[in-house]
């Protein structure tokens, strides 16, 4: 529910209105409508906001330090720097722009083969190709597989492909069958320095971030490559040969030939990678001389070498709110300070302004003075106990035009007259929703039309509001009769229209407006403090005047003010969650869930004055006790509510400091909310650093200046303040350009939000797409208040259609400069959950705006931010805030404790063992803030950050730094999913590290498998059948244990295809969720060993809840016994919160026990996905067998059967296990004896518990126990089986394994023609790790001499011999009269090259004859040619001798080698007359012959239907017979030939349906899906459509029939192997 941690967390959609407004009904209901303000008109067909949206007294209030995180690298410094104040010197870094600057290592280094460590400091830009290669080891030889080697980079981990990008490390040794990729534990953070390290020791891959181990894998084993292929390996930096290029800075780079330990990596990181040369250190780079070691790729560029200034601060000031929070005031440390320090809750005076509207004569006010005065008294009384007092200002406005109109609080005016009754718009003065809420009679409208009278029975949208007469001020009183939402005279206004008319400054007062709701149910609406509008004219509180200042209703305003000051409803955690799986559900009072107050018990929404009873919407709560029903933030009546809790009071004071300082007369600056932190010490000094003030300001605020936008370094950061687009605006205003102004406020990136601009907002859904046609597409123009020379641009693109990959959505960004020049930045790769950042350091001139272009009509843009270079002229005159350090005992007078722009202080006046308290005061002008919380430091003792864990001070870890995100927080608390060991702490992300530790046995499926309690046995499904079987979602995927990587998802829109690889769901259901008829889906799983069930366990991947619905899905479960009897286990609610679902089986003890063999599961939602079903039974205990034991028998748990009772336990037989060593506890195998079985090298344990349950154990040994004369486990050591060698193990080879493929066996290989064996040993050996040995010979692909090309001469002499390397060329030249096909008619190329390809064959090359154009059509049928129209062909027309005798020459022409004729034909003398009028025309053709019918005359031919085209078809073929693959010739005219025949013959001409003008628009149109229309421009095949996903139009078009991929040239119909390669 948060935005990104490095930028302002604002913009929670209200749980009440879904659009940023909190509301309070009149004890009846909450209004669910999203209310968005309209914008001024901007001319026809455009959508813009050309007026400023209101002045802010402060910038969008960032959390303290969040501004800084945008600009400042978070770096660990050298330990030596801890005692000094001087910043570290700048170091060099390479900047890669992502446009072909990848480097390759040119130094003659022997790259590590067996183990290595790679370390790099980098800062990545937001938005990358996926994958983006930071560095990688590749194989350049043609005779090896290209996916071998290792890569470090960034890629997306989500099925959707444009979200959740993470750092990754992938490796595939030359012996491995597949690549292993491990990912970091979270998305990468753009613009932040990070230290990455990757290690491999021949057994384990590990990835480290900032010294913390975040991922590991044991899949790859052994060496990386053999010495034989050393020369094939190339080390790349900044990208790959396939242009998977990285964008960002790379600073230090080092490569070791050993796997460094975590402690060594932490040490390397702190020394910034600078080492004295060591034998195991192969390469360390600080970019002093890049060209000496690295070279750019062919036709590539070199990255820029820059100086990077590491920030001098050691304290990470990036504080995150909890998952359910929004701003700094939700951070648990910050709000704890406000709870604990009374000084932070000192008296505050807040100004508020009541907007009271009168008529023009200053009469008939909206509310009376008595109401205003009484409400003010009640307000003052309610807040007086909490040190908040209110200063009233009343603004009287005389305007009859406003006073006589109805002001609507919660009605979207665009819904009036939309043929659907909207209760919130059902009011007398809206004509009862424009007639939509009335059953209308049909009056004689035509008789009353334009009769000069407003006829109320015709005053509805259906009758155009009486033809407009009811909105004519010359005819009627429009304040009572005008209901037309499009009329400027209408009798009602939306409350935001009122705000736009008044345009009251929201930065100095809390504005109180009055508006009505339909049926007067809505009592109030408030603006959250994190909304964009909070300090603008569109903010404030809207109240119902009928309740304002009325006894019994005065607490409504107090409730709404609570919302404005950051308070949620006390029932948020129960009644305002999206589902019972919502992470914000409150089960106990907490700072992190529900209403974020830990002194309000969970409660559901109700209006009674007492604890509520349980209800249907309480997620299993059986009762609520000690609920805060008397709280102002409940829905109880005024005679019940009377207080705020201390936590709520702290939140209100925090928001008054964070956001609303400008509402207060006091000029006191905001405090530093947290205690200063000790970041270093020496024997005689201590170093302190502290957080910025809570409001994020660094300079004194001055009216009319930009100082409130300036950060440390005098860098100006501003969001767009004016937006426009040529795209039309929707009437609701949602997705309008205005939504892209201000700071980002989308609550959930990657989900569509009305708080963004989208080009599709007002597109008519009935129009044919696309809305954004190529090549330009749609664009959004954003302007910034202050033109500046930019350093960087940040854009939040929060939604991209699944039809587009990350690179196609934003096809250009243009910078608009003051000089009038537009600078194009080109297409950009975007992620929907990571903002796009673009460096603009080279622009060098002032920019005032940007234009963002897109081809994706569903794209959504949330915000844009422009950052200046250092020392911006706009910030140079700003006065920095000062900080005063208060110490107890006090500092000496001569010690400077007053600092500015430096949040660091060194105290050298210390005594060993003395206790010191430090507080920070912020100074602005003559005003001082309240002191910060105190830091208590005992000189000579420990502190958080010294590497020693002081448990008595609450420390859980200490990694010797003050940085978050590395497993140990800056407050020395262990971070979620990390475990820290040793001192100083070494932290690792434990979930998925391959080690099953005691604390994660019950929680980590990845490391420990599915947890089974002691005494039980879980049996997973061995077979399955399903109701909706399909090859896309087969039922067999639920067999066995569920995939460890799957996470349960709730509130989904649809299920991606990737889910069907791990879980079953009814994927054949294609109709929309809302139109789904009642359907029962079922899954039945079978188990190989029938058992007495103790429980059924069901693992979910989705819980069936739909994104737009609150309904919880239920599931019905039955057990089937061995007699096919059904046993009902009841109905159960599905929830990801309770995953897996464990259903206990209760047996009726009055009935016999039964063995269960199957489980039947049924449900009704197509959004339920199940990944596994288990049957839990008692281990070594079977009640059914036990009950069958006869007299003299006893139940044996080992045998699980009845055995004859014996008083003396029997010994076990001698344990014999081949290929194993045994270590037994005794020489005698009596009852209870144990033996440890360890397999020899190359053998693996096989454990057999009974005939059906068999599994392999990877572990090296196992212990077996003698129980009642029988070993409890049957164990064998089987040889490792390497399987048939993979075809990539030796490229271009075939394998023969006559000895088998188990441990120690050998296979031979032979090179496939034309590959040549390079080396002598063509054998492979199966090794103990289950992989084949490195080959000691290779099959080098060579081409034989190229075959002769007809009609061409070989020009390259060496090509007449054999043995040509892959990639070599041979040159040919076509013989005279022949040319290369495809060359232009004007310049026919004769020379061409063929290349030796990777499969050992040559590229095809051909020479085709030169051809001449056909002679003019009037000679058709009269000439004979010796060889058609090809070179050297002779064509002649026989004329009578009289032609030659009269000197006209012979009628013979020759085709010359340049493609022209040697002459031209003439009409013979005897060829006289004219053609007869054309007949045999098809009925749908028409002919125009303006020149008559003489020889050579032409007649234009066309179709009567303008949507058809005229074509030629063969004889006896009609239009109905045309197959889709036929491309008939178009014909536009016929000509009368010299033989007095029409050509083409009119009878062969037909009319066929023409092509619709939507080819190449990314939608497959059935009418165009034929060769005649170029198969709709490629839109009907996945391989040819630009979006790589076929979208039929209309949606009902069958993808297997009319909208199928028919293009024979598409890859789908090409049998050639088209596999790509991994590793970028």
From Swiss-Prot:
Catalytic activity: Cleavage of the 135-Met-|-Lys-136 bond in insulin-like growth factor binding protein (IGFBP)-4, and the 143-Ser-|-Lys-144 bond in IGFBP-5
Tissue note: Detected in kidney, spleen, brain, ovary, breast, skin, prostate, uterus, and placenta.
Cofactor note: Binds 1 zinc ion per subunit.
One annotated Gene Ontology cellular component of this protein: extracellular space
Biased composition (Low complexity): 42-51
Coiled coil: none
Signal peptide residues on this chain, from the entry's feature table: 1-22
Disulfide bond annotation, renumbered to this chain: 141-232, 324-619, 329-654, 411-425, 421-437, 454-470, 471-482, 580-597, 584-609, 707-875, 710-878, 750-832, 772-778, 944-972, 957-968, 980-987, 996-1008, 1033-1067, 1048-1136, 1189-1202, 1212-1266, 1224-1235, 1239-1277, 1282-1326, 1297-1307, 1311-1339, 1343-1396, 1359-1370, 1374-1407, 1412-1455, 1425-1435, 1439-1468, 1475-1536, 1489-1499, 1503-1551, 1555-1573
UniProt-listed SMART domains: CCP, LamGL, NL
The protein's Enzyme Commission number: 3.4.24.79
Cofactor(s) of this protein: Zn(2+)
Glycosylation sites: 387, 398, 426, 516, 598, 616, 722, 822, 1023, 1219, 1223, 1320, 1516
Protein name: Pappalysin-1
Organism listed in the record: Mus musculus (Mouse)
